[in-house]
Amino acid sequence: MRPLTADLLLRAYASGVFPMARSRDENRLYWVDPEQRGILPLEAFHVPKSLRRTLRSERFDIRCDTAFEAVMRACGEATADRPETWINEQIIRLFVELFELGLGHSVEVWQDGELVGGLYGLALGAAFFGESMFSRRTDASKVALVHLVARLRHGGFRLLDTQFVTEHLKQFGAQEISRAAYQDRLADALAETAWFDRNATVAWEVALV
């Protein structure tokens, strides 16, 4: 693979492919273009009732884009249920560049001044590419996802790409679509303009359909 730059990374995402490392300690990256692509339809997002109680409790403080690299590094940490991750130093470096360009974004969950959950991704046009999430408290990553969807709906986004579908995401309505169907949705989203306003106050209820 040729040396990966932020510009090349943007062109890759715009064409429907994304990079991964086999492990966080491996320097090489490879391109991924799944036959079945995971998406989370913004118009059919489901918030489980039990999670709504957590959201209403306001036990967490939600911030955007205040600790982008810290979120990435937390997503790249090994955990009991995720002993290996694909986020290596090259990916972190490139996404930090995209963050500095205003294209990378993080949704962060804080509790008592401690970063306890969050997610990060990339915004292009009206498409948002969700990369990874982490949780150090019960429901923290789920709360981050709900707040992400609320912000995306508020900003006029059309596509939330999750790359793959996990059991964690299925409860929110994530689904797999064919590569061809994904390319159609991606093209439509890239042709439009949306706005990820990191400073806006957006209630989580905006995520509700």
Swiss-Prot record:
One of its GO terms (molecular function) is leucyl-tRNA--protein transferase activity. Its EC number is 2.3.2.6. SUPFAM superfamilies: Acyl-CoA N-acyltransferases (Nat). Its main location: cytoplasm. It holds the Pfam family Leu_Phe_trans. It is found in: Cytoplasm. It comes from the Bacteria. It catalyses: N-terminal L-lysyl-[protein] + L-leucyl-tRNA(Leu) = N-terminal L-leucyl-L-lysyl-[protein] + tRNA(Leu) + H(+); N-terminal L-arginyl-[protein] + L-leucyl-tRNA(Leu) = N-terminal L-leucyl-L-arginyl-[protein] + tRNA(Leu) + H(+); L-phenylalanyl-tRNA(Phe) + an N-terminal L-alpha-aminoacyl-[protein] = an N-terminal L-phenylalanyl-L-alpha-aminoacyl-[protein] + tRNA(Phe). Keywords: Acyltransferase, Cytoplasm, Transferase. HAMAP family: Leu_Phe_trans (MF_00688). Belongs to the L/F-transferase family. Functions in the N-end rule pathway of protein degradation where it conjugates Leu, Phe and, less efficiently, Met from aminoacyl-tRNAs to the N-termini of proteins containing an N-terminal arginine or lysine. This is Leucyl/phenylalanyl-tRNA--protein transferase. It comes from Paramagnetospirillum magneticum (strain ATCC 700264 / AMB-1).
